[in-house]
From Swiss-Prot:
Induction: Strongly and specifically induced by organic peroxides. Repressed by OhrR. Pfam families: OsmC (PF02566). Involved in organic hydroperoxide resistance. One of its GO terms (biological process) is response to oxidative stress. It comes from the Bacteria. Gene3D superfamilies: 2.20.25.10, 3.30.300.20. InterPro entries: KH_dom-like_a/b (IPR015946), OHR (IPR019953), OsmC/Ohr_fam (IPR003718), OsmC/Ohrsf (IPR036102). This is Organic hydroperoxide resistance protein OhrA. Belongs to the OsmC/Ohr family.
């Protein structure tokens, strides 16, 4: 394994109906499944899919900007990650599905699509999910 540039550390207590806390305490969030009594009772609660979506969107947008800089292309981008909890018919368990919606200003749709494909090849989240999670890339017109 390569030498880490940095390591993020977060602990969970109570699973999907508990809390997550980062070692530096920047994150200290209640976790609840949407629609559960706990979720209805809490004013603000997140869930693992929402946290994954936040990380993937930020990471992919950074990868997209890296690719654009490398290609000397100036583009303003916005990435929205939709992460769904799905029933896994293979084992009757659960799995994740991801749709990344990318908007860009300053380039044509075909140029943006090419940048998105390249970003998907270098994004650490995309690398981690490759072959494990179905990821759909959508480029907004």
């Amino acid at each position: 394994m390569s030498q880490p540039l940095f390591t993020a550390t977060v602990s969970a207590v109570g699973g999907r109906e508990g809390k997550v806390i980062s070692s530096d305490r920047v994150l200290e969030l209640d976790v609840a499944m949407p629609g559960t009594p706990r979720a209805k009772k809490l004013e603000k609660a997140t869930n693992p899919e929402q946290l994954f979506a936040a990380g993937y969107a930020a990471c992919f947008d950074s990868a997209l900007q890296l690719v654009a800089r490398t290609e000397r292309v100036k583009v303003e981008t916005e990435v929205t990650a939709n992460v769904s909890l799905l029933k896994d018919e293979a084992d009757q368990g659960y799995k994740l599905g991801v749709t990344l919606q990318v908007k860009g200003e300053g380039v044509s749709a075909s140029e943006l699509e090419a940048l998105v494909k390249k970003a998907h090849g270098v994004c650490p989240y995309s690398k981690a999910t490759s072959g494990n999670i179905d990821v759909t890339l959508e480029v907004a017109e």
